[in-house]
């Protein structure tokens, strides 16, 4: 799917004004091997525990984007090389992490988009804590399962519905 977030913003100024198209804060860095990705959102809300991330990525991604609201924690990584490979294998379009990743070199080789706040060498806990498929608030932007995510080098858009066919 070819698109530019800049063009989508220009073409949908009415949606931006109405709040049905939103722009995430420009704080996410690219780590995956794919720099432009889009798809309907699947959501996770968790904190310093990536058990649910693995569970989600083990499912058929069907071109979806996994949005991981890790509370913005910079104390450990929620996605690493093994999970990047799992996302690629299972057909996920991308992962947006409000938190950290690790194994940056491995993630760069995965054919999946990965955006995160930073890299961190420490792994997360594995307690099975968190919530899946619920609305999340990522840095002030509400994302509900099924919202459309569009990401490229210029930013990340969240739309209530698909903007492209």
From Swiss-Prot:
It catalyses: 4-hydroxy-4-methyl-2-oxoglutarate = 2 pyruvate; oxaloacetate + H(+) = pyruvate + CO2. The keyword Nucleus does not apply. A divalent metal cation binds at residue 103. Gene3D superfamilies: Ribonuclease E inhibitor RraA/RraA-like (3.50.30.40). Keywords: Lyase, Metal-binding. GO terms for molecular function: 4-hydroxy-4-methyl-2-oxoglutarate aldolase activity; metal ion binding; oxaloacetate decarboxylase activity; ribonuclease inhibitor activity. InterPro entries: RraA, RraA/RraA-like, RraA/RraA-like_sf. It is an enzyme of class 4 (lyase). Substrate binds at residues 80-83, 102. Its cofactor is a divalent metal cation. Pfam families: RraA-like (PF03737). Its EC number is 4.1.3.17, 4.1.1.112. Divalent metal cation. One of its GO terms (biological process) is regulation of RNA metabolic process. It comes from the Bacteria. Belongs to the class II aldolase/RraA-like family. Homotrimer. Catalyzes the aldol cleavage of 4-hydroxy-4-methyl-2-oxoglutarate (HMG) into 2 molecules of pyruvate. Also contains a secondary oxaloacetate (OAA) decarboxylase activity due to the common pyruvate enolate transition state formed following C-C bond cleavage in the retro-aldol and decarboxylation reactions. This is Putative 4-hydroxy-4-methyl-2-oxoglutarate aldolase. It comes from Burkholderia mallei (strain ATCC 23344).
């Amino acid at each position: 799917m070819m698109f530019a977030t800049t063009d989508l913003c220009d073409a949908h100024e009415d949606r931006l004004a109405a709040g049905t198209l939103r722009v995430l804060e420009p704080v996410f860095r690219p780590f995956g091997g794919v720099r432009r990705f889009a798809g309907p959102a699947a959501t996770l809300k968790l904190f310093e525990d990536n058990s649910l991330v693995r569970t989600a990525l083990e499912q058929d991604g069907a071109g979806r984007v996994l949005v991981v609201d890790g509370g913005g924690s910079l104390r450990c990584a929620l996605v690493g090389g093994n999970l990047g490979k799992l996302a690629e294998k299972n057909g996920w379009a991308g992962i947006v992490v409000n938190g950290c990743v690790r194994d940056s070199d491995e993630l760069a080789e995965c054919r999946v988009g990965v955006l995160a706040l930073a890299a961190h060498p420490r792994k997360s806990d594995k307690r099975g804590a968190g919530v899946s498929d619920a609305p999340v608030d990522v840095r002030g932007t509400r994302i509900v399962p099924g919202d459309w995510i569009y990401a490229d080098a210029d930013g990340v858009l969240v739309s209530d519905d698909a903007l492209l066919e």
